[in-house]
């Protein structure tokens, strides 16, 4: 289930869009491993990718939340964003390393299902609200 960047994901902020592209690229790396399904132990590689994804997501979420504060984004939508960001990180951190070691492909596929659904919802619903806010602000409508 490769995720391809599409303009529908654009949040009207070049930096956020570039960061979303990077997150998609990292999720697609995980997908490549899941598609191999060749019986080779890739535990260390998978853990490294998961840790990189978590670290990059924390960096990205920090950037977004800083933007919310700097642009005067409303507190209700900021809180929704923060809760979703925390949920994402918590999910990555909750991966049971024993389960991963025992069932690499199954664990990776389960996480991919979560990641693809979360990313689609988060960007297309939650982040696009912020993108629309930025667009209106730039147009002088706010």
Predicted regions and their residues:
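Small-residue-biased structural context
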Residues: 1-142
């Amino acid at each position: 289930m490769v995720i391809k960047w599409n303009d529908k994901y654009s949040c009207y902020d070049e930096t956020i869009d570039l960061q979303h592209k990077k997150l998609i690229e990292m999720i697609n790396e995980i997908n490549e491993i899941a598609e191999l399904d060749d019986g080779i132990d890739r535990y260390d590689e998978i853990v490294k990718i998961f840790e990189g994804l978590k670290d990059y997501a924390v960096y990205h979420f920090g950037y977004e939340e800083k933007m919310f504060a700097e642009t005067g984004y409303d507190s209700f939508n900021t809180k929704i964003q923060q809760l979703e960001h925390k949920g994402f990180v918590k999910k990555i951190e909750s991966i049971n390393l024993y389960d991963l070691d025992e069932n690499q492909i199954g664990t990776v596929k389960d996480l991919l299902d979560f990641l693809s659904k979360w990313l689609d919802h988060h960007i297309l619903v939650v982040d696009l609200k912020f993108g629309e806010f930025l667009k209106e602000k730039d147009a002088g409508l706010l």
